[in-house]
Amino acid sequence: MEMFTFFLLTCIFLPLVRGHSLFTCEPITVPRCMKMAYNMTFFPNLMGHYDQSIAAVEMEHFLPLANLECSPNIETFLCKAFVPTCTEQIHVVPPCRKLCEKVYSDCKKLIDTFGIRWPEELECDRLQYCDETVPVTFDPHTEFLGPQKKTEQVQRDIGFWCPRHLKTSGGQGYKFLGIDQCAPPCPNMYFKSDELEFAKSFIGTVSIFCLCATLFTFLTFLIDVRRFRYPERPIIYYSVCYSIVSLMYFIGFLLGDSTACNKADEKLELGDTVVLGSQNKACTVLFMLLYFFTMAGTVWWVILTITWFLAAGRKWSCEAIEQKAVWFHAVAWGTPGFLTVMLLAMNKVEGDNISGVCFVGLYDLDASRYFVLLPLCLCVFVGLSLLLAGIISLNHVRQVIQHDGRNQEKLKKFMIRIGVFSGLYLVPLVTLLGCYVYEQVNRITWEITWVSDHCRQYHIPCPYQAKAKARPELALFMIKYLMTLIVGISAVFWVGSKKTCTEWAGFFKRNRKRDPISESRRVLQESCEFFLKHNSKVKHKKKHYKPSSHKLKVISKSMGTSTGATANHGTSAVAITSHDYLGQETLTEIQTSPETSMREVKADGASTPRLREQDCGEPASPAASISRLSGEQVDRKGQAGSVSESARSEGRISPKSDITDTGLAQSNNLQVPSSSEPSSLKGSTSLLVHPVSGVRKEQGGGCHSDT
């Protein structure tokens, strides 16, 4: 039971001991009060004066009353009020209420005449009734113990007392250096105005740079969404988070101290103070967005390492990882949201008078330790462990395929990309953690030094512990803000490649309008250049001609406007095998119709309907080609007679071998891709070009759009 009572008393009085230290009396040194019946006093007094020198200065306002002796008890009352009685048994003895009422009634006229402001702490209604007939005991050993008590006065630490201009109204939950209803000063308590201006400009510049980099990553994703699948997709969400973080710091740079600081109130004698708590709506919104997306960006990086580990270590496919996307989003957005709500409920919002934003843990070490430092350390540990496990798995795969030079080189490049990207993220983040740890260790020393430097200016007690003064360096805070922002730039490295440049070039090319007439001229010019180039090669290799391997290329240029899914002015080239030889300078113009966009032209002048079009970009499989050709061969044998008659009606002679040549042509598996829909082929021009026999056959390339 005694132990429980001791523990309860310790919990009750521990905050008082923290604020004012242990109780200690000290001898009176004020000359006017040295004639009193007591010679020991204790500070601070009822008015909050922390030593006798300040109390003596404040007593000078009441000297007219003492000099004119408006009341016989005026000096007794003033000494008991400003230099209170202190005994080892009763501790502090304030003046009695009856004494206060008698002195105030006797001196009221002089108080009004001289305009003396009566302190609120000395209002008689606040004092208690006491028995003044009890004499104050005088200890004869007091003079002998005087020097010892004076030594205790020098070493006594009564803790931090909040200056008057930093006090806040009740109910807002402000707390500074362990004192309730007290707020930090604004501008920053550690740095000068010129240093703060330089730091704000630096933070604003870095935030703009990081914002541009992260937006570039996100816009690259929007250009080609299918390019970034899992396990790489978290990089995009990671970039979005840090783009919001950069935007918040840029907004703080524009707002200055208007959001992070409270304006001074001259009527209440309050100075500029830092915003603490969630009463300021603008500061609360900045805090919610900044803290939420800072934590979310870190969690998305951890999820990125998880997806890499599943792909490299567990051999999961992209589709299998993508099925877990809902859980990834739940963790990435749910965890920061939960922490943000907890901080709002605990009223831990704090204004940052360096960057202009609002965050957590700037003045509260516990909040910084549990809501910033601990989550970041946990994310770094988990992410680094999974990253190392994935790299070890990839290295094992590289050793297995060491005889496959091409795949081994690709895997090596991929591992290098992962290593560089992880380094660009981990190095700034670990540096940021180092800044937070260093601040945790030295924050108390910085605060004691600040109190020691400004205690006389603010008329508050000066701490005696400040023997080795230490002040924070501006470079430390600038590194902390730099590492906070530069973490998001690492995503640019992952998307920075030749393919990204090609995608951006194609994006601007598709969005640039072209003149239809100029485009038609350009198409015709390219066709002529192509014909002349390949015709010269045919002349050069005329002697080496083989009828069974000769090929023709047909280039179709559409000058109309297509309403279909394919692009206008499309270009398609097909290789057609023939067994006869055409003239080297023969140029045949083929008029297309809505039914057929192209015809396969044979060397003897006969034309046959083209084969089925092949899908864009997808090469035909062997099984599909054989089944398709077997069906088409029957149709072509039945239509051989009609084809010959059609050729004769157009003024061309069809040899008897047309039917057999048709079968031979089908065996070559020729496919003619169409450049546009049939409705857009009116007025199109087809050019028949003689290429050399060694020209390479193009497959599946007819859907490429020039626009």
Curated annotation (Swiss-Prot):
Residues 647-659, 695-707 have a biased composition (Basic and acidic residues). The keyword Endoplasmic reticulum applies. Residues 20-202, 256-285, 347-371, 439-474 are extracellular. InterPro entries: Frizzled/SFRP, Frizzled/Smoothened_7TM, Frizzled_dom, Frizzled_dom_sf, FZ6_CRD, FZD6_7TM, GPCR_2-like_7TM. Residues 1-19 form the signal peptide. One of its GO terms (cellular component) is endoplasmic reticulum membrane. One of its GO terms (molecular function) is Wnt-protein binding. Residues 663-673 have a biased composition (Polar residues). A motif (Lys-Thr-X-X-X-Trp motif, mediates interaction with the PDZ domain of Dvl family members) lies at residues 498-503. Glycans are attached at N39, N353. Keywords: Cell membrane, Cytoplasmic vesicle, Developmental protein, Disulfide bond, Endoplasmic reticulum, G-protein coupled receptor, Glycoprotein, Membrane, Neurogenesis, Phosphoprotein, Receptor, Signal, Transducer, Transmembrane, Transmembrane helix, Ubl conjugation, Wnt signaling pathway. Coiled coil: none annotated. Residues 224-234, 307-325, 393-417, 496-707 are cytoplasmic. Residues 589-707 are annotated as: Disordered. Residues 674-686 have a biased composition (Low complexity). Residues 20-133 form the FZ domain. The modification Phosphoserine is found at S654. It is a multi-pass membrane protein. Pfam families: Frizzled (PF01534), Fz (PF01392). Belongs to the G-protein coupled receptor Fz/Smo family. Receptor for Wnt proteins. Most of frizzled receptors are coupled to the beta-catenin canonical signaling pathway, which leads to the activation of disheveled proteins, inhibition of GSK-3 kinase, nuclear accumulation of beta-catenin and activation of Wnt target genes. A second signaling pathway involving PKC and calcium fluxes has been seen for some family members, but it is not yet clear if it represents a distinct pathway or if it can be integrated in the canonical pathway, as PKC seems to be required for Wnt-mediated inactivation of GSK-3 kinase. Interacts with LMBR1L. Lys-Thr-X-X-X-Trp motif interacts with the PDZ domain of Dvl (Disheveled) family members and is involved in the activation of the Wnt/beta-catenin signaling pathway. The FZ domain is involved in binding with Wnt ligands. This is Frizzled-6. It comes from Pongo abelii. The gene is FZD6.
